[in-house]
């Protein structure tokens, strides 16, 4: 494929935009470098770049797009609302309608508040948990990304009794000292951290199904034990469902798994492609938030009518019959096809799939925790990524990310993807 116009625009972008991108995940640094492809248009399962190339898209904006690009029903809703106004700074009926649809789908959201991103949602749930418990420390799991606020950009210490350290320049040591990081799916490490820190722990932050070092399921009983241990310690359980809400079924992962948290953060999919975030949970905890309580959270754009209208339209599409069955079927076809090709070409790789989402790891281990992904073959992934890109298959440029299917992908798209993977694997020997 020819990418000359993307290369030209990337050089121009570097003159004005720091690093040439507005999020570091969009650069190709993790796959060997080069100018990222500059996209011009999205339709359904496809993206079109400035050089006129067409791509089958499995990036899907890192997860928010589940109904395909420019879905007619959502696009129409956005256009209609834009003609009426996009921001009022007052309550609207749309906020009520959208909140009701969300609570009907996720019953644990007894009370809801909207923000503008997953980062804001998680940041605020931590503040609310601290206000409710009157404690400061939180526990998170290694490898899970919860946004770019100081509170969660913390790397693990050497063990469950060790405090974290900043995972980014600009994060104060004093902030990192309030965070303990333990391995996902390691209930003994979690138990040890709780026993050591005791009544200092306000909350534990959990991705019920991990989506930030690929797609990883909790081990049987893990989430149930986290809930029990936490509640026995007076510690709140916060689920980060920014990726998982409405990803696997019409609702949240918590309902699919049958384990209910105290608070939930959500975002990505529920905005229909527009900026959104939100959080909710038990009424007695949520009443800590202003104007009812002392925990302050506000936002000029929070609950704006454009995002509310898009979210309502998105849920109207997803609540139709057969949506998630199709995603699961396509995911199964893609997984089975890739596994056959891995065997055919004797490639060292494994796959984790959860319904219509999967991750291809270049390792011989079944991935259950972050360290396995950290030590997987990033160079091999980088080669695979570029070989696929040059055949019109758009993946996330990182070995840690997932492939996302949408309602608009077809069986023919899967066949074309597998044909491209067949060639890519053949060039990696």
From Swiss-Prot:
SUPFAM superfamilies: PLP-dependent transferases (SSF53383). Homodimer. One of its GO terms (molecular function) is glutamate-1-semialdehyde 2,1-aminomutase activity. Its cofactor is pyridoxal 5'-phosphate. It comes from the Bacteria. This is Glutamate-1-semialdehyde 2,1-aminomutase 2. The modification N6-(pyridoxal phosphate)lysine is found at residue 268. Belongs to the class-III pyridoxal-phosphate-dependent aminotransferase family. HemL subfamily. It is found in: Cytoplasm. It catalyses: (S)-4-amino-5-oxopentanoate = 5-aminolevulinate. Its main location: cytoplasm. Pathway: Porphyrin-containing compound metabolism; protoporphyrin-IX biosynthesis; 5-aminolevulinate from L-glutamyl-tRNA(Glu): step 2/2. PROSITE patterns: AA_TRANSFER_CLASS_3. GO terms for biological process: protoporphyrinogen IX biosynthetic process. Pfam families: Aminotran_3. Its EC number is 5.4.3.8. Keywords: Cytoplasm, Isomerase, Porphyrin biosynthesis, Pyridoxal phosphate. One of its GO terms (cellular component) is cytoplasm.
């Amino acid at each position: 494929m020819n990418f000359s116009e993307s290369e030209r625009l990337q050089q121009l972008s570097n003159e004005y935009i720091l690093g040439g991108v507005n999020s570091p995940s969009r650069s190709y640094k993790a796959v060997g470098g080069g100018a990222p492809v500059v996209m011009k248009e999205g339709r359904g399962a496809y993206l079109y770049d400035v050089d006129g190339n067409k791509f089958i898209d499995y990036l899907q904006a890192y997860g928010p797009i589940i109904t395909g690009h420019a879905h007619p029903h959502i696009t129409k809703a956005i256009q209609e609302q834009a003609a009426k106004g996009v921001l009022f700074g007052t309550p609207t009926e749309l906020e009520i309608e959208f909140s009701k649809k969300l609570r009907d789908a996720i019953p644990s959201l007894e009370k809801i508040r909207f923000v503008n991103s997953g980062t804001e949602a998680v940041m605020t749930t931590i503040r609310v948990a601290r206000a409710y418990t009157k404690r400061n420390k939180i526990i998170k799991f290694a490898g899970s990304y919860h946004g770019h606020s100081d509170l969660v950009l913390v790397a693990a210490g050497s063990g469950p009794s060790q405090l974290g350290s900043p995972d980014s320049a600009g994060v104060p040591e004093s902030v990192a000292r309030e965070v303990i990081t333990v391995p996902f799916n390691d209930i003994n490490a979690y138990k040890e951290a709780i026993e050591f820190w005791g009544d200092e722990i306000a909350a534990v932050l959990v991705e019920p199904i991990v989506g930030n070092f690929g797609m990883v399921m909790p081990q049987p009983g893990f989430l149930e034990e986290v809930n029990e241990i936490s509640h026995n310690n007076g510690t709140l359980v916060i689920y980060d469902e920014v990726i998982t809400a409405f990803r696997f079924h019409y609702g949240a992962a918590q309902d699919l798994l049958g384990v209910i948290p105290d608070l939930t953060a959500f975002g990505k999919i529920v905005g229909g492609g527009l900026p959104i975030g939100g959080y909710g949970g038990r009424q007695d905890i949520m009443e800590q938030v202003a104007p009812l309580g002392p925990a302050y959270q506000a936002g000029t754009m929070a609950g704006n009518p454009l995002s509310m209208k898009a979210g309502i339209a998105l849920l109207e599409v997803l609540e139709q019959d057969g949506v998630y069955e199709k995603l699961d079927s396509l995911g199964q076809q893609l997984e089975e096809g890739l596994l056959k090709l891995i065997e055919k070409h004797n490639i060292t790789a494994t796959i984790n799939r959860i319904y219509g989402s999967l991750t291809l790891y270049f390792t011989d281990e079944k991935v259950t925790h972050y360290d396995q992904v950290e030590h997987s073959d990033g160079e091999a992934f980088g080669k695979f990524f570029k070989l696929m890109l040059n055949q019109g298959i758009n993946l996330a440029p990182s070995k840690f990310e997932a492939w996302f299917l949408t309602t608009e992908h077809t069986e023919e798209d899967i066949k074309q993807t597998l044909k491209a993977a067949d060639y890519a694997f053949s060039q990696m020997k």
